[in-house]
Amino acid sequence: MLISEDIKLDYSDVLIRPKRSTLTSRYDVDMTRTFNFVHSGRTWSGVPIMASNMDTVGTPKMYERLLEHNMITCPARHYMKKDATWWRVGTTDNKMLGKNVCMMGGIDEIGHMVTHHLKWEFIGIDVANGYTISVIDAIKDIRLRVPEATIVAGNVVTADMTQELILAGADIVKVGVGPGSVCTTRTKTGIGYPQLSAVIECADALMD
């Protein structure tokens, strides 16, 4: 057993210190960024914020609002199952939707969806424990079947596994185990990692 003695921080542990600015209004702030994804070969420009695929977050209304600001929405799973509009996003007969949508699911779910719909720009593998070999295998499988897709995979909280997912073919890594206010992973299993430290360490791993 290894006990880490380093200080680990959650977002609630820190504040953002203000500094001198030449901006005259908050409306002058431009958060647009451009990303070149290594594996998919795609270039994406927008505000790098993703709405989670949680039940009350990844909704059609959320998608409409975030699309106005060029942000990304991950539809909640129950929408993909019951709502044909979401389910058919990215297919050739429904081109109105599909921009800035990341279709996410578990290993079996996303494998089934990819079989029937190959036109999605973003495809996400979302499991509670991203440390299993099955996640690596799923990334490699989807990368082989849809090489032009930008793949999101997780969840992990450490640098070593972040690198493993990227090497397997993921373009974006989903970071976090148990940080949510309604998530019971930490209280029931004792497994987790302070979220701010997880994000910093996983991001640093990609700079090596």
Regions found by a protein language model. Give the residues of each.
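Active-site entrance/lid segments in N-terminal catalytic domains of soluble metabolic enzymes
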Residues: M1-D208
